[in-house]
Amino acid sequence: MATVKIALPPAAFIPASSNGAQFKVNAGTNFPVNALAFDASTAESVYAAFRAASYGSGNLTLTLAWYADTASSGDVVWGAQIAAITPDTDTQDVETKSFATASTVTDSHLGTTGQRLHSCSITISNLDSLAANDRVDLRIYRDAAAGGDTMAGDALLTMAELSYSDT
């Protein structure tokens, strides 16, 4: 049994046509940091597609690396959902396919430093009949309207990693 891991850097995502997270390149002191900026007051989304090569069974785990643009406290509610299509089998129109029910996680800013890197994981259990080698569309969003999302300012997503079992 092995774990398949798919790294998804910010450039792998397409912002939603309406309320999409902004792609940013922050110069940094020693190196640039690419990120997707999710607003505190507007629900913003990004999308990425991948092939579920060697998917076996079980839930997907989405690990997010993020930091606050300016805040040094508060909570961020992240959400994710997938839509899976089996090529040559499913009759669903690829342009109108619906997403499965979202899964969310609330992650707390650990304080003291505004641009401190944080990590959280979302267990995606609504799998939309996922099968090996499916085309999978992934949506990630910040649920700015959730009562538990209390962090002011942008949350900047620097990396996402999707993992699943091949058995």
Locate the predicted segments by residue.
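N-terminal leader/pro-regions and domain N-caps
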Residues: M1-S41
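Short beta-strands within extracellular/lumenal beta-sheet-rich domains
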Residues: D39-S54
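Extended, low-complexity, turn-rich repeat/linker tracts enriched in Gly/Pro/Ser/Thr and Asp/Glu
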Residues: S54-G58, Y67-D75, T86-T89, A146-G148
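Short coil-to-beta strand junction motifs in C2/discoidin
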Residues: S72-A80, G153-L157
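Extracellular carbohydrate recognition and processing domains
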Residues: D90-D128
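Cysteine-clustered segments with highest specificity for TGF-beta superfamily mature ligands
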Residues: H118-G147
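Proprotein-processing/basic-patch segments
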Residues: Y141-T167
